[in-house]
Amino acid sequence: MDALNKLSATEAAARIAAGKLKSEALVAACLERIGQRESDVQAWAAVDPEAALAQARARDKEPRRTRLHGIPAGVKDVFDTADLPTEYGSPIYRGNRTTCDAACVAQVRELGGVILGKTVTTEFATRYPGKTRNPHNLKHTPGGSSQGSAAAVADWMVPLAFGTQTTSSVIRPAAYCGVVGYKPSFGLVNRTGLKALSDSFDHIGTLTRTVPDAALIVEELSGGPVTSFDAVAGMKPRIGFCRTPYWSQADRPTQEALEQAVPRLQRAGARVNVVGLDGEFARLVEVHTSISTYEMFRALAYERTRFPEQISEMLMGRLLGGGRVTREQYEEAQAVAQRCRARLADVFRDHDALISPSAMGEAPEGLDSTGDPVFGASWTVLHVPAVTVPVFRGPRGLPLGAQIVGPYGKDSPTLLCAEWVHRALTH
C-alpha cells in the first residue's frame, strides 16, 4: 500500500468511501510525517495531535456524508479556530484564542473533514516572512503569504490546506513549492472569520497536490456541481499565451519554459495564440497597490495605533503608504479595475483560458523575502479564477509553475483546462 500521507485527497476519499481506509490511519500518517520533518520545514503554527486523532476517530464512527469526510486539512493561521490558537503571524496576537471558527473551517467540520492544525502565515498575510522553509531546498523561501500551507502540502504532511490571496499569496508559494495553487473567482468561498486586509481583493484559496483535489474542496464548500475530469483527455481547449505587461520581469528560464510549452500544447490538441493585455492592464500592479494599501491602512487600524512597535518595519511602511492614498486616487483605481475586468471578459469570448507565468522564477535563496508577487497581482485585481500547476523545473532544480487563468465565475472549466495543461506538459 502507498504511504498514506502521500495519498491525494481524491484518492483518500475514494478509499474511505470504499471502506478501505480509516480517517484515523490517514491522520496518524500525516502526524507521523509532521513529526519527522517539522523541525526542518517549520510549516505549522499549531498542531494538537490528540485532538486531530479524536476528530478522525469520530469521523470513522459516523456515516460518510461528503467527499471531505475523514480528510485532514491544514488551515492558514489567519482564519479563526475555536480549538487552536489564532495568531495571524504577529506577536500582537501571541496565544490569542478566538471563540468560534471561521466559516470555511466550520464548513469543513460540518462536511466531515478533520482540522489537522494551523499553518504558518507571514505577518497578517502580508510580506514579512514567517519561519517556514521550502521543502525542496531548506535554504530557499517557500513564498508567501500562505507559506506554511504550501510547504506542508508539498512535504506530504497534509493532502490539502487553506490559503488566502490578496496579491499572489496562493499562486506564488504553490509555484515555489511545486504544488497546485487555486485562487477561485472572487467571493466563491465565504470569508467570515478571516482576518481582513482588503475587502476588494481578499480571496480564500487552496493548496493541494492535484487539480481534482482543488476542485473537491472548493466545490464542497461552495455547494457547486462536481467537476468530472473524465473528459479531460478529449479536450481541445482554446488557450491564449499571455505574457502580461510584466513579462520582462520574469527570468529567462521562466520565459523559455513557457515559450517552449506552446508547441507542446498545440501538439496535444490545443489551439494556442498570443494574447496581449495592453493599455490600462499595464497599470494593474499600481492599481492593486493603491486599493490594497488604502484598505489595509484601515483594516489594521487597531494594531497600527495600539501596537506600532510590534509591527514590522516592512509592514508599517506599507500601511503608512496606504494612509497617503487619497479617496480620489482610490476611486480612480477602482474604476480602472472595473474597466479592465470588462475588457478581459471580451478576451475570454475567444479563449477558454490564458496561460502565463506563476512567478518570476524559482524560489529565491534566503528566508528574508518571500519573492515578488507581480505575476499574481493583476489576476487578483481582475477577480478571475487562477490555478498554478507544477510543470517545469528551473536551473537549480526547483519547481516552476504555469498559471492558468479563466473567466470570472467559470471555475470548473478553468480547473479542467488546468488539469489538461498539467497532463499535456508532464506526460
Feature-to-residue mapping (PLM):
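Structural helix-boundary/capping segments
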Residues: 36, 154-248, 259-268, 331, ...
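Short glycine/serine-rich loop/turn segments
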Residues: 69-203, 242-244, 357-370
